[in-house]
Regions:
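Positively charged n-region of N-terminal signal peptides that target proteins for export
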Residues: 1-5
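Bacterial N-terminal signal peptides
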Residues: 7-16
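Glycan-recognition and catalytic cores of secretory/periplasmic carbohydrate-active enzymes
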Residues: 20-438
């Protein structure tokens, strides 16, 4: 393994001063809430994947911990300047994290959370032990690509390499190239990028004649299981990674994929100031549903230079949020009826506000951030960290603080309130908000 030296990565984070108000106080409050949440994890779930705040118990995804929260949260600590907490988390990771476990893991989830988190933290710290862990994980995930099409199976056993789960979706197949490509760049081993790029290309070439994809496909046969197209969970980050692959790796094919894909999405899925569902083959509208996961799209549109569309859609997302004082998982945008009432501490609407502020410097996106933050504190804060909501209508609490709350939700709020912490145009965020260098 030959690592490139990116140890000065943190130096590019400090820049300029904010142009309005007192961003330091807002960002410091977010930092305080991060610490509040992290200390709850330390007290009740240390060494485990996630915290259940109400029951004060840990949760492990697969029966044995892969340190999801520490790995996911480490680069947030580094960005926030929480050096003591970062050192403690990094020590836990390098001393205790092992992937030599008989666990069938979801390739997508461990890639965006663990591989992405290890790579970004390595780039920030220069600690080669983090890159070694990333390379070990990458090697253990490679057997997932051994399908007849080259599109990865949904699960792989970390110890045996046995892959399973032939029915997958575009997001799980196409949201690997940033992490695997970065691993190739840092280790000078092209196999990771090649496997992920081939999978993305195989999926893309199965788009319909009008340029849309469905939301379920068999990776062994290459046949679509569901022809429903949308921009929500199951398809979302497939689109996002086409754009970001083109930007991060200057990849012509990825750029072309994004241009053609987003053109089809805008033509057939856009519905006024919303994006709905349609049949991938005919473009016929099949549903008028939109939700928390769909709210990634304004960020992608802004990054892709389609600012007007991005701004209109973020305004729609904000209306969805304000209707109940926090966003539901899914609504019918024609009736504004809640279809799925939970709130999972998701970051996407905040991510989009951050991207739009960086793209326009319009203070209203910071004002949106204040609404998001105030509502989070009002409805999701517990005596021990933050938790999901079972219903945004009744505000009944769930009992989980997902690792992405520390990796994404609070990170994007912090960066929205204090752009000095990171130079936006020098990094590309993976879909778990782990910044990777150009």
């Amino acid at each position: 393994m030959r690592a490139t030296t990116t140890f000065l990565f943190c130096a590019v984070f400090l820049w300029g001063t904010a142009s309005f108000g007192n961003p330091a106080s807002d960002a410091d409050e977010v930092k305080s809430e991060f610490l509040y949440s992290w200390h709850a994890y330390e007290q009740y779930a240390w060494g485990h994947d996630e915290l259940r705040p109400l029951s004060k118990t840990p949760r492990d995804w697969y029966g044995d911990s892969l340190l999801m929260t520490p790995v996911d949260a480490l680069d947030t600590m580094l960005i926030m300047g929480l050096n003591d907490e970062a050192m403690k988390a990094k020590t836990l990771i390098v001393e205790k994290l092992s992937f030599d476990k008989n666990l069938d893991v979801k390739v997508f989830e461990v890639t965006i959370r663990l591989l992405g988190g290890l790579l970004s933290s390595y780039e920030m710290t220069g600690d080669a032990r983090l890159l070694h862990l990333a390379e070990d994980l990458g090697n253990r995930l490679l057997p997932a690509f051994n399908s007849p099409t080259g599109m990865p199976y949904m699960f792989v056993n970390l110890r045996t390499g046995k892959a399973s789960g032939a029915k997958s979706n575009p997001a799980e197949i196409g949201t690997l190239i940033l992490e695997f490509g970065t691993l190739s760049r840092l280790t000078h081993q092209p196999v990771y990028f090649e496997k992920a790029k081939h999978a993305l290309e195989e999926l893309y070439k199965r788009r319909s004649k009008i340029g849309l994809v469905g939301d379920e496909i068999n990776v062994e046969t290459g046949e679509w299981v569901s022809t429903t197209s949308h921009v929500g969970g199951g398809i979302d980050s497939y689109l996002e990674y086409q754009l970001k692959c083109g930007l991060l790796f200057h990849d012509r094919e990825c750029r072309s994929m994004w241009r053609h894909s987003i053109s089809a999405v805008n033509r057939y899925l856009a519905d006024g100031q919303w994006y709905g569902e349609a049949d991938m083959n005919t473009g016929k509208r099949t549903a008028t549903e939109f939700g928390a996961l769909h709210a990634f799209l304004p960020a992608a549109l802004a990054l892709g230079g389609q600012l007007e569309r991005a701004q209109l859609l973020e305004d729609s997302c904000f209306r969805m949020w304000k209707r109940h004082g926090i966003e539901p998982e899914v609504i019918d945008y024609k009736t504004m009826e809640v279809k799925s009432p939970g709130y999972q501490l998701r970051p996407e609407i905040i991510e989009s506000a951050y991207y739009l502020y960086e793209s326009t410097h319009d203070k209203r996106y910071v004002d949106m951030g204040h609404v998001f933050f105030d509502n989070l504190k009002k409805w999701c804060r517990t005596d021990d960290g933050y938790t999901t909501l079972k219903s945004v209508v009744t505000k009944e609490k769930g009992d989980l603080m997902p690792s992405y709350f520390l990796a994404e939700t609070l990170k994007y709020l912090y960066l929205l309130f204090d752009g000095r912490a990171l130079e936006f145009h020098k990094v590309i965020f993976n879909t778990e908000a782990h910044p990777l260098t150009h």
